[in-house]
Amino acid sequence: MAMTYHLDVVSAEQQMFSGLVEKIQVTGSEGELGIYPGHAPLLTAIKPGMIRIVKQHGHEEFIYLSGGILEVQLGNVTVLADTAIRGQDLDEARAMEAKRKAEEHISSSHGDVDYAQASAELAKAIAQLRVIELTKKAM
């Protein structure tokens, strides 16, 4: 039987996941993180993107995170997300439209374009589309 630890993924709105997992993958402030049983204690910011949860027995779940905090303690990992949305709850058409609009803003020749905000919106839309894609593959 594979080693596991307890994971809680919560947002301001609701608890998204609580249970035993074999590992998770998430994007921290310094890059990609893989958290396995026995990981050293850690507290880090999470960048907007996804969390890949490998549950007990290898089943996978993907959740979009708009950012937040990851805390790793012995046998327990907590993700406090600003916003968390399950892959199956994301709207693909809305994410595609947001991506298109962000790309238009970036390529716009107007001087009043906020590139940082447009880039953040583009990254958010791309991350949501990736979560949708991976969720479909896992089903």
UniProtKB/Swiss-Prot annotation:
GO terms for cellular component: plasma membrane; proton-transporting ATP synthase complex. CDD domains: F1-ATPase_delta (cd12152). It is found in: Cell inner membrane. Keywords: ATP synthesis, Cell inner membrane, Cell membrane, CF(1), Hydrogen ion transport, Ion transport, Membrane, Transport. It is a peripheral membrane protein. One of its GO terms (molecular function) is ATP binding. Its main location: membrane. SUPFAM superfamilies: Epsilon subunit of F1F0-ATP synthase C-terminal domain, Epsilon subunit of F1F0-ATP synthase N-terminal domain. The keyword Cell membrane applies. Produces ATP from ADP in the presence of a proton gradient across the membrane. HAMAP family: ATP_synth_epsil_bac. F-type ATPases have 2 components, CF(1) - the catalytic core - and CF(0) - the membrane proton channel. CF(1) has five subunits: alpha(3), beta(3), gamma(1), delta(1), epsilon(1). CF(0) has three main subunits: a, b and c. This is ATP synthase epsilon chain. It comes from Escherichia coli O157:H7. The lineage of its organism: Bacteria, Pseudomonadati, Pseudomonadota, Gammaproteobacteria, Enterobacterales.
